[in-house]
C-alpha cells in the first residue's frame, strides 16, 4: 500500500479577523483620504496666501510706482529699511508698543483674573468681566474715534485734569511728540486686557482644585498661592496671550491711521502704516512690499521664539 503524503494544512483564520495586509492597505487608504479632505483647504491657502506672498516678495525686488514699468532693484528696498531713519524709527515704535499691547495687559489681566476668581459669585463680578472684554468686540474705527475725542485738547481727559487742578498737565496728547506714542499704546492696553483676562480665567478654571487646597494646608497666603499654583498653571495661556498680543502690536495700522496718521512728524509711524503710506501715498510700491516682507519675517520670528519657550519650561 503506497504511503500517502500528508501536507500540513494551513491554520484557518477565525471568521471576522482580517489579515495584516488589508489592515495596512486600509491604513494607507484612510491616510490618503485625510489628505484628500484637506486638499480644498490647502488649495485655498495656496491661492489666497502663498501666491500673494510670492508676488509680494517678487515686487519687493523692483522699483515700481504701481503704474509705470518697474526696474530691477535687487535688495535695495531691503537695505533702505536699515538706512532710512524713519523706517528704523517705525520698527522701534512697534517694539515699544509691545510693552503696552503685551506686557502691561498680561500683567494686569493676571492680577484681575486671580482677584475675580477668588471673589467667586460676588454680585457684579460677571458684569465687570464683560465690561473688560467689551473693547474686543467694538470696531477699531469706533475705538480710535472715541479715544481721539478723549485725548483732544478739549476732550474728557484734559477737562478732568483741569477740574482737579492739574491744568499744567493737560495737553494735546496725540499731538505732543513726547506723549503721542504712549497715548496710542494705552489704547492698545485697553484693547488687549480683555482678551488676556478671558484666557486666564479659562485657564484658572482648568487648574485642579486640589492644588489650591494643598497650598492652603501648607499655610500659603493669596500671594504665595498665586505664584506657586496659579502662575505655573497658566503657562500655556500666557504663551497664547503673548503670541496674540505681540502680533497685534506689530501689525497695528488702523488705530494709527485714524488717530494720528503717523504724527506728529513720525512720532507714531509704524511699519504697517508705512506700507500703506508708501504704496498709496508716495508711489513706492516696491519699498512698501519690502517693508511688508520684513515685518512678516519679524512677526514669524517672534512667534517662533515665544512658542518655543513653552515646551522647554514644561520639561523642567
Tell me what each language-model feature is:
Residues 22-36:
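A detector for short, charged/polar N-terminal pre-domain segments
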Residues 33-316:
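A structural signal for multi-pass alpha-helical bundles of membrane permease subunits
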Residues 1-21:
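Short, intrinsically disordered terminal tails adjacent to the first/last structured region
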Residues 18-24, 255-258:
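Short glycine/proline-rich turn/loop motifs
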Residues 3, 23-26, 54-55:
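Gly/Trp-centered helix-boundary motif
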Residues 14, 29, 164-166:
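Short, aromatic- and cysteine-enriched interfacial helices/patches
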Amino acid at each position: 500500500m503506497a504511503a500517502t503524503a500528508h501536507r500540513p494544512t494551513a491554520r484557518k483564520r477565525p471568521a471576522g479577523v482580517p489579515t495584516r495586509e488589508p489592515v495596512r492597505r486600509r491604513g494607507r487608504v484612510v491616510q490618503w483620504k485625510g489628505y484628500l479632505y484637506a486638499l480644498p483647504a490647502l488649495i485655498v491657502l495656496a491661492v489666497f496666501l502663498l501666491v500673494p506672498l510670492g508676488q509680494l516678495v517678487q515686487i519687493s525686488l523692483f522699483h515700481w510706482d504701481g503704474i509705470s514699468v518697474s526696474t530691477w532693484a535687487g535688495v535695495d528696498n531691503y537695505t533702505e529699511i536699515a538706512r532710512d531713519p524713519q523706517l528704523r524709527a517705525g520698527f522701534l515704535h512697534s517694539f515699544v508698543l509691545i510693552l503696552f499691547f503685551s506686557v502691561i495687559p498680561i500683567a494686569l489681566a493676571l492680577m484681575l483674573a486671580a482677584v475675580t476668581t477668588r471673589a467667586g459669585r460676588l454680585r457684579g463680578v460677571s458684569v465687570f468681566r464683560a465690561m473688560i472684554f467689551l473693547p474686543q468686540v467694538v470696531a477699531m474705527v469706533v475705538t480710535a474715534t472715541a479715544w481721539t475725542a478723549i485725548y483732544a485738547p478739549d476732550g474728557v481727559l484734559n477737562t478732568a485734569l483741569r477740574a482737579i487742578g492739574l491744568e499744567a498737565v493737560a495737553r494735546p496728547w496725540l499731538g505732543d511728540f513726547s506723549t503721542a506714542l504712549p497715548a496710542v499704546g494705552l489704547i492698545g492696553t485697553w484693547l488687549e486686557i480683555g482678551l488676556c483676562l478671558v484666557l486666564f480665567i479659562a485657564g484658572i478654571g482648568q487648574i485642579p482644585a486640589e492644588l489650591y487646597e494643598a497650598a492652603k494646608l501648607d499655610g500659603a497666603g493669596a500671594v504665595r498661592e498665586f505664584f506657586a499654583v496659579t502662575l505655573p498653571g497658566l503657562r500655556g495661556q500666557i504663551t497664547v496671550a503673548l503670541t496674540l498680543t505681540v502680533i497685534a502690536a506689530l501689525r497695528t495700522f488702523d488705530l494709527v491711521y485714524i488717530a494720528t496718521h503717523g504724527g506728529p512728524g513720525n512720532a507714531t509711524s509704524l511699519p504697517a502704516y508705512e506700507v500703506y503710506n508708501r504704496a498709496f501715498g508716495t508711489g513706492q510700491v516696491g519699498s512698501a512690499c519690502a517693508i511688508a516682507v520684513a515685518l512678516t519675517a519679524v512677526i514669524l520670528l517672534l512667534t517662533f521664539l515665544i512658542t518655543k519657550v513653552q515646551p522647554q519650561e514644561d520639561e523642567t
